[in-house]
Amino acid sequence: DALPILNAAKLAVADINAAGGLLGRSVELVDYDDALDTNQAVSIAEKLTTKDGVVAIVSGSYSGPTRVAAPIIQAAGIPMVSAYAVHPDVVNAGDYIFSQSFPGQVQGKAGAVLAVDKLGAKRISIIAVDLDYGSELAGTFEEYAKAHGAEIVSYDKVAMSDNEFTSIITKLKQDVKPDLIYMANYYAHASEVMKQCKTLGLDVPVVGTEGVDSWQFLETAGKNADGLYLTTNMDRDTKDENTQKFMKDYRATYNK
């Protein structure tokens, strides 16, 4: 999931250097993969702040690794911007830590407003990845939905490694009978959920989150993506020139 962030960072570095760099110097990009492992995240944060001599950091990792890295980066006095992490502890690490993503509480509530107030859902099933991301979004979604007349009729937590959802969707269709599914997960899970809903004939609205907002989802889901609603902070219809230029350059460079 971090690949789009790394690709975007490479584009930014290329643009900056083409314009003469920063303060007369070329920008160099150093990248590491924490593999969603908090121990690796700590090691990488320590290396970046003590050995690599970086002046700014962009995190394309999830909340768990970013939460443990943030205090180290804060203590070093180096600014960091998180692309994905939604847990409030990330930005609460200090005034050098920023996030461009929705806080989990905001996006979870937005999903519930869409599901309950706009789509009229009364019986909702939740499928959430068993990480900070899933628990933050699903928790806030559930709180708002219940307070506004909806019932959470099932709640399935899934591991990042899970890649088969036939049993869950079969249970929802035959026994639970929701009128909407809320997914607090990432594109690989969402692709399989949408596929199984279509295959098994569970024809209900599905509301996803920005973790699904990726060209990788469209590639893996194909026609099964039809009918999915998303809460996301990327407005592709905006007339903002910088955003439109970024999308044009990204597609031209990466064919995505």
Language-model features: locations:
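Mature extracellular/periplasmic domains of secretome proteins
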Residues: 45-53, 72-75, 113, 170-173, ...
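Loop/turn elements at helix/coil->beta-strand transitions in domains of secreted/extracellular proteins
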Residues: 24-28, 51-56, 75-80, 93-96, ...
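Extracellular/periplasmic periplasmic-binding protein-like sensory domains
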Residues: 194-256
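Second-shell loop/turn segments in exported
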Residues: 31-34, 55, 95-101, 129-131, ...
